[in-house]
Regions:
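Short Fe-S-cluster ligation motifs
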Residues: 75, 79-96, 127-151
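Long, compositionally biased charged/polar accessory segments in the mid-to-C-terminal portions
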Residues: 143-146, 151-168
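Amphipathic alpha-helical blocks and their helix-capping loop/short-beta junctions
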Residues: 113-128, 133
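Loop-centered beta-sheet repeat module
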Residues: 11-65
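Immediate flanking context of iron-sulfur cluster ligation sites
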Residues: 37-46, 87-98
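Single conserved hydrophobic/aromatic residue that forms the stacking wall/gate
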Residues: 1-6, 10
């Protein structure tokens, strides 16, 4: 098992760095060295339940227990079938992923946006209207999301998500 004092696991089961919040990317190094693990970290959430209270699908069942199959991120990224009808009205405007639990976390209030240009949105996305999203072709999808995690859901998955939001 891996250990690190660089981040802690919090109630919503995301890694959190006390200085950077939970908006960061992970990397790993494969080493052939024996390293001494850092001391275990303490719970910094205290009695806060903002992430649990804010989750519209109740995917965070209780502290440190997340039912991924209820998470908006699962429905919009990983699910390959139809989004279940009971989720109607709970997805707000999330057509890919969801950051509600991160948005309400007090540890993220001072998080800095990345300055990494590779994480900037494709310029064509910045001015898209709802109509543009509904009319998005597979070719345009491939062009604007070729270097993006959004390609994981695929064009058909994104169309499903957009239609589902439009039906709600």
């Amino acid at each position: 098992p891996a250990s690190s004092a660089a981040s802690d696991v919090y109630k919503r089961q995301l890694l959190l760095n006390k200085h950077a919040g939970s908006y960061f990317y992970l990397a790993e190094m494969m080493l052939d060295l024996e390293l001494e693990p850092d001391a275990p970290v303490t719970d910094h959430c205290g009695s806060c339940t903002r992430c649990i209270d804010a989750c519209p699908t109740n995917a965070i069942i209780r502290p440190y227990v997340v039912d991924g199959s209820k998470c908006i991120s699962y429905f919009t990224i990983e699910l390959r079938g139809a989004i279940p009808e009971p989720v109607h009205g709970q997805m707000e405007n999330w057509m890919f992923g969801c950051d509600i639990c991160q948005e309400v976390c007090p540890w993220n209030r001072h998080a800095s946006p990345t300055t990494e240009p590779r994480f900037s949105p494709h310029p064509r996305l910045l001015d898209m209207t709802k109509s543009d999203w509904l009319d998005l072709t597979e070719d345009v999808f491939r062009e604007v999301f070729k270097d993006s995690a959004v390609k994981r859901t695929g064009w058909m998955g994104l169309q499903r998500n957009i239609s589902f939001l439009g039906d709600a």
